[in-house]
Amino acid sequence: MGSHRVFRSFWWATNALLALSLLGTLSTGIWEHSVRQYLKGFSDAIIPEDSSPQQKAEAILAWISYGPPRREASDTSGLSAHDPTDTLNYRQLLDVCGSATNAFLNLSRSSGLEARRLLLLSPDRTAKHVVAEVHLDGRWVIVDATYRAMMKDTQGKPLTRADLQDPRLFQEATARIPGYIPVYSYERVAHVRVGALPVLGPVLRRVLDAVLPGWDESLEWSLLLERRSFAYFFLSVWALIFFLLLRIVLAWLADHRLRIPRLRLRASLTRATATFFSTPEIK
């Protein structure tokens, strides 16, 4: 009997968490949808409809550089670098490499461009700068939103991170950017810095590299890092899946091993629906 009480407590806790994760999925899904609609309206307003992919990227950079006056926050602690309504509207965030890159990436995605973040790493593998990669004509070219520039050579050809590992091309590209800090070089780069996690980081990266080669090239990882609404929606969906599977396992144990009567959700919903829609009998 004691084990049955423990099981029942676990069963009801699982049902409660399943309900909460369902509510979380619905609310964060609505949040993410509203953010996407906001970004779509924003990008439609600043990017001409018939623009080529490169023109779209350059139009976004031009808006970041020469757009309308931005708000000034007296206290930036209340701003989020992962909320587009903040990164697109506050000058302080558009002056920081991480949040400026997030603003560029969010507008790029909403305009139909494939874009992802790229971390430039120091020798000890800490991030020293953040830029974006945009997929143009089959190549991932570098856009530095902090300096409002697409990296190009002297002929105007956009450059990839592999190109910028060549000292000559790096010098050509950065010479045309006023105030560029040369230490922001491309010898060591990463899309997601899992290795920075304490203890588990290096192990997790090795496991992911073995199980999912090229996993960090995925655009979804970049979206998780740059948009808070999508990150919460992603976590809510996985919580919903986890608790739903856990409920199925517990239901099987209750029916086939412990022989414990339990609330059958489908049967209860069927009875409730039948009662609601049935015509009352008048005597």
Where are these regions (language model features)?
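Extracytoplasmic/lumenal ectodomains and periplasmic regions of secretory and membrane proteins
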Residues: 147-219
